[in-house]
Regions:
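Alpha-helical transmembrane segments in inner-membrane proteins
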Residues: 1-312
Length: 312
């Protein structure tokens, strides 16, 4: 265990060091302007990338544990789609001209999507995992339709920024967004740690968990609530960076399959490393253009998702 943590910490430290050092502009550490670029632009962006990656990975492993389904992640369950739909509608209504309003609407969209998925998946007195996944897929299709209509009605001047946000971007990262996402992630991990033993028992099935005294519906509510809130916050500030919550938990389980309490920080470290590295590549692969982070995570995630689907 200690070796796995050490390896992930070293990889994250290397990724952060490289991401801070390299970019579209070379930094001279003796130059005042370079130090300002580092403190106001590059460092908050790199730390936000780490926070976003950790958040999505923690949400992903929580969804997979609750649903006992290896294909579950915030992107597939419709949480990310709800946030994107909220942002698209806000853009169509020209709310983007009010600073900070689009992320707030996106966050609200993520929470509404979570509530809708839960209501659709509810069956008598329990939540059906299969219905939950199907509900997420159906809602994603609905959100896609609303997004297309919203973009068709959006003013041209706001459309470019909205499209970049949809593809995942950390451009314009601020210390405020770093603190917001990191704080929510810390609170969520503490909350999930308190129900970690119950989540571990849920892996063996709801009936077995109930027989051992677990309040299954309460644990589901806490788990889904915590994972959805941090996902909404992450998507609100970075747009859609898909497949992190799917890819990272599976890779981490190759080295650690036991206690859920230790799986959470391992996934957080792995997710942070992946998104920091993806952001670095998106900034330097083409010098004059910043590519969307979501494209790189999708390139890694789609083949992995298909292999999981085939095995399942």
């Amino acid at each position: 265990m200690s070796r796995a943590v050490l390896i992930l910490v070293v990889l994250l430290a290397i990724s952060i060091a490289l991401a801070v050092t390299f970019g579209s502009v070379s930094l001279d550490w003796n130059d005042e302007t370079a130090r300002m670029i580092l403190l106001r632009l590059r460092l908050p962006r790199v730390l936000l990338a780490a926070a976003i990656g950790a958040t999505l990975a923690v949400a992903g492993v929580t969804f997979q544990t609750l649903l006992r389904n290896p294909l579950a992640d915030p992107f597939i369950l419709g949480v990310s789609g709800g946030a994107a739909c909220g942002a698209a509608v806000a853009t169509a209504l020209r709310l983007g001209r009010i600073p900070g309003l689009v992320p707030i609407v996106a966050f609200a969209g993520a929470l509404l999507a979570t509530a809708a998925v839960f209501l659709l998946a509810r069956r008598r007195d329990h939540t059906d995992p299969v219905r939950l996944l199907i509900s997420g897929l159906v809602l994603n299709a609905f959100f896609s339709a609303v997004i297309l209509i919203s973009f068709a009605l959006s003013p041209q001047s706001d459309l470019t920024a909205a499209l970049k946000w949809m593809m995942g971007t950390l451009f314009g990262a601020t210390w405020t967004s770093v603190i917001l996402v990191s704080s929510l992630l810390a609170v969520a991990m503490i909350v999930l740690a308190f129900v970690a033993n119950d989540l571990r028992l849920l892996v063996f099935g709801e009936e077995d968990a109930k027989a051992r005294g677990v309040d299954v519906e309460r644990v589901k509510l806490i788990g889904f609530g915590a994972a959805s809130i941090i996902t909404g916050a992450a998507v609100a500030v970075s747009g859609i960076i898909g497949f992190v919550g799917l890819l990272v938990p599976h890779l981490i389980r190759l080295i650690w399959r036991r206690d859920f309490r230790l799986l959470l920080p391992l996934c957080a470290l792995g997710g942070a490393t992946l998104v920091v590295a993806a952001d670095l590549v998106s900034r330097i692969v083409i010098r004059s253009t910043e590519l969307p982070i979501g494209a790189f995570t999708a390139i890694l995630g789609v083949p992995f998702f298909l292999s999981l689907l085939r095995r399942s």
